[in-house]
């Protein structure tokens, strides 16, 4: 149950974070861990 819930939770969390920070763009300059 949790194995299927966790990825969905992460996607929702990431989406809400992106919506809360409109200046963040997922361009070629964006990489995991880069701020």
Curated annotation (Swiss-Prot):
Keywords: Amidation, G-protein coupled receptor impairing toxin, Pyrrolidone carboxylic acid, Secreted, Signal, Toxin. The modification Pyrrolidone carboxylic acid is found at residue 23. It is found in: Secreted. GO terms for cellular component: extracellular region. GO terms for molecular function: toxin activity. Residues 1-22 form the signal peptide. Its main location: secreted. It comes from the Eukaryota. The modification Proline amide is found at residue 32. Expressed by the venom secretory cell of the spine. The spine is a cuticular structure containing a single large nucleated venom-secreting cell at its base. It is an independent unit capable of producing, storing and injecting venom. On the back of D.vulnerans caterpillars, spines are grouped together by 50 to 100 to form scoli, of which there are eight in D.vulnerans. Belongs to the limacoditoxin-1 (ACP-like) family. Potently activates insect GPCR. More precisely, it activates the ACP receptor (ACPR) from the mosquito A.aegypti (EC(50)=3.07 nM) with a potency comparable to that of the endogenous ligand. Has no activity on receptors of the closely related neuropeptides adipokinetic hormone and corazonin. In vivo, does not reveal any observable effects when injected into crickets (A.domesticus). Does not induce increase in intracellular calcium in mouse DRG neurons, suggesting that it does not induce pain. Extremely abundant peptide in the venom (almost one-quarter of all toxin-encoding transcripts, and the highest represented peptide by proteomics methods). This is Z-limacoditoxin(1)-Dv4. It comes from Doratifera vulnerans.
